[in-house]
Amino acid sequence: MKDRFKQKYTAGAAVAYMSRKQALKKLQLTLKDFRRLCIIKGIYPHEPAHKKQANKGSTANKVFYYRKDINFLAHEPIINKFRDYKVFLRKLNHLKAKKEEDKLKKLYENKPVYSLDTIVKERFPTFGSALRDMDDALSLCFTFAMLPHTRVLKEGMIDSCRKLTAEFMHYVIESQSLRNTFISIKGIYYQAEVHGEKITWVVPHERGLPHVTDVDFTVLVTFVEFYIAMLGFVNFKLYQDIGLFYPPQIGQVVKTDEMETEEYKEKVYSLAKPLAKRKDVEQAEDDEPLDLLGEDSDALAQKVREAKSIKTMFKGCVFYLNRECPKEALTFIIRNGGGIVGWEGGPTDLKADSKNISHHVVDRPMDKLEVNRLYVQPQWVFDCLNARRKLPTERYMPGVALPPHFSPFTSEKAGDYIPFERLEELRSMGKDVSDLEAAIPKTMDELPMRRKEVKPEKPKGIHIAVGQMHKKSKEKFHETVEKGQELKMRELMISKKHQRVYHSMKTTFKRNRNDALKLKKKAKLAKATEA
């Protein structure tokens, strides 16, 4: 009897969810401040399963949040800082109108500032959870580091992005944890293995960017603000783990005044010089196997071998970069492999005519070539890292058409189109490609040709043909028929619940096969036109 007279919309989705308008009213915040708060705290909207019930009978489109999330936000101390800042702006406008310079200066000195340190610790209770969220943080900070400063993009924020991203790249170099890289239209993709976690990020290409006017940066700025605080914590912990000074230093003893100079900062953040390590910390020789525990012995041994080959790939090699080459990207990869890098006016004081240079990286044809060094195009450095070894330089010489640059982030599956060059690359890396080769779909030209049967002309009039003995079917034919019948029987046994999934899988397989055939035909046609 009690449930019979229960009031409507007092349980279920109607209570579990709250609309954005209700949330703004509860928190007494503007939409702009509410968005900032949600981004900083990691709260995002949810789509209710029963939208009409959550909306209390209405069918209007609304943005919904969990009620427990809004109650959680109501106790956040940073809300008071948002309100203090509104009061500060009101006072600022008042004093500007009165032109009271002394009071205005004093007000600027007491400007309300909030710290995100507590929120970072709250959102990432363990260091591993922070590393797992590094992909977006690094990609966004690297993008902002390339942008010019505007009214929204403050100069201090862009400088912080440049500083923190350079510090992270220095850590990757010193720990030699870079594993893969790929050049794309969007930028250069990198993948590093830090404490057993794979971190992948993209860095835009080095080029001058104009002021971007068609993008609303107000939301992105809040993300960057949080990521700057997070990267500061992560970089400090990573530097402590391998015994580096933080902030990074080149020498053992550096004065504070010297560290603030632009010349010193240029040397530190150019990535060309190694960082100084603390004497009180003893670094283990090889910590790589510790990060790979829990895997089978073969995979573990393979990963250890790959990591070792990457660390010593460019050992003893001295690279000189021409001015047209992307210096940061090449320095990052070469120093990760144990090489030495220099360029004109660089911090390593390496001259172009030095006899110590073993590799000269150029992207333009050169008139004068030295005999005692190898000349390569920038792609050679990227391909060497992905191949885990120094590749032959003949195909990468200046003016030569470069080989295809394959992505190491895609995994080859049986039945996909895999170019011949990629198969050769996998074979050279010691991988078994026989299954991949066998599963590549064949075009009509590659199928075995059957001899055309010439039918004898029927003689006119009544004719009785001489009886002939038919040959027995081959074993392969019987096997094919039996396999086809077995497959049909198994398909009939699939339940109705899973039939749709099975048919969609079959359609996807056929589509992928057709796409692979089309790509193979295109590659064949391209080779024919080149020849």
Swiss-Prot record:
Pfam families: BRCT_2, Pescadillo_N. SUPFAM superfamilies: BRCT domain (SSF52113). Signal peptide: none annotated. Gene3D superfamilies: BRCT domain (3.40.50.10190). GO terms for cellular component: nucleoplasm; PeBoW complex; preribosome, large subunit precursor. SMART domains: BRCT (SM00292). GO terms for molecular function: ribonucleoprotein complex binding; RNA binding. One of its GO terms (biological process) is maturation of 5.8S rRNA from tricistronic rRNA transcript (SSU-rRNA, 5.8S rRNA, LSU-rRNA). Keywords: Nucleus, Ribosome biogenesis, rRNA processing. Its main location: nucleus. Belongs to the pescadillo family. PANTHER family: PESCADILLO - RELATED (PTHR12221), PESCADILLO HOMOLOG (PTHR12221:SF6). Required for maturation of ribosomal RNAs and formation of the large ribosomal subunit. This is Pescadillo homolog. It comes from Caenorhabditis elegans. The gene is lpd-7.
